[in-house]
Amino acid sequence: MLITLEGIDGAGKSTLYEGLKTRLQDLEPVFTKEPGSPLVNSAVRREIGANRDPFAEATLFVADHAAHLAQVVLPALEEKKLVISDRYSDSRFAYQQVSLIGIVPDPKAWLTAVHAGWSVRPDLTILLLISPETAMNRLHERPGKEHFEDPAFLEEVQKKYLERVTEDPERFLLIDAAQEPETILDFVEKSIRALPRQ
């Protein structure tokens, strides 16, 4: 079973991810994240920090996803393990669909085409929803800054996430990320434990 954690920067994905690592040890899940492939991840981070090209950045994220699937996700799923990933393909359909506007004619169609036939659909996606203003307040407390951290940009990204929900509603569990982290963790843990095991 593949479970993914999604949401805009500052929504609390990493906090939830780390909490689940502690809470779900008895299930022996494989915890992973994107970007995660060591070689591609370093290139992605360089691109984010440099004079970036959104198309090059998007292709690097797709390459990382391919490596992540081949090296981590598919082997674990073949062994019938529970896989929990901090970010996955929905991040591309949210972030890159916005960043590629004006660069490719139809960002959604391009992203759909490059993922078609090989990317694996998650069994459950936990989407943390929060106002961009609250997310920005949280991000300002973090060291470092990435170009994605802009309230107008984050608002558009969250809209793209919600479009994904409309297209595949049965896959998503929506969470109000303005709640206390422990409240969110309790609810998500119970939700995961209630899932039928494959």
UniProtKB/Swiss-Prot annotation:
The keyword Nucleotide-binding applies. Its EC number is 2.7.4.9. One of its GO terms (cellular component) is cytoplasm. It holds the Pfam family Thymidylate_kin. It catalyses: dTMP + ATP = dTDP + ADP. The keyword ATP-binding applies. One of its GO terms (biological process) is dTTP biosynthetic process. Keywords: ATP-binding, Kinase, Nucleotide biosynthesis, Nucleotide-binding, Transferase. Signal peptide: none annotated. It comes from the Archaea. GO terms for molecular function: ATP binding; dTMP kinase activity. ATP binds at G7, I8, D9, G10, A11, G12, K13, S14. Belongs to the thymidylate kinase family. PANTHER family: THYMIDYLATE KINASE, UMP-CMP KINASE 2, MITOCHONDRIAL. This is Probable thymidylate kinase. The gene is tmk.
